[in-house]
Amino acid sequence: MCIRDRAGVVDAVGGNTLANACAQTRYGGVVTACGLAESAALPATVMPFILRGVVLRGVDSVMAPSGPRLAAWARLARDMDLERLETMITEIGLSDVNGVAPDVLAGKVTGRLLVDVNR
């Protein structure tokens, strides 16, 4: 995907990943931040916000009222293509983690890894 090609981004990592998402979002795009796994810091400039009108919107997953939360889950259940979701997830066993870690660190893994701690 080309730089400044994204209309919207959902980021659950924070830090440099969130800063890069803002930098790569097109004019009028929206970036949502819902996690800080990498860092709570935002090492970015205000350029995407000023020059392209990018919006950074926080997602409250802790204190959000139950009404909107239930509505969001209902919409996901209705609209999510489960076959597409399954293509984004690779299940590995806990015993596989050390072998997969170098690929994760090298950026060779796409999607999400689901670790089965019983394997």
What are these regions, as identified by a protein language model?
Residues 70-119:
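C-terminal hydrophobic helical "lid"/dimerization subdomain
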Residues 13:
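Conserved NAD(P)H cofactor-binding loop of Rossmann-fold oxidoreductase domains
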Residues 7-10:
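N-terminal Rossmann-like NAD(P) cofactor-binding module of classical short-chain dehydrogenase/reductase
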Residues 1-3:
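Short, small-residue-biased leader/transition segments that mark boundaries at the very start
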Residues 16-82, 117-119:
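Glycine-rich phosphate-binding loop and adjacent beta-alpha segment
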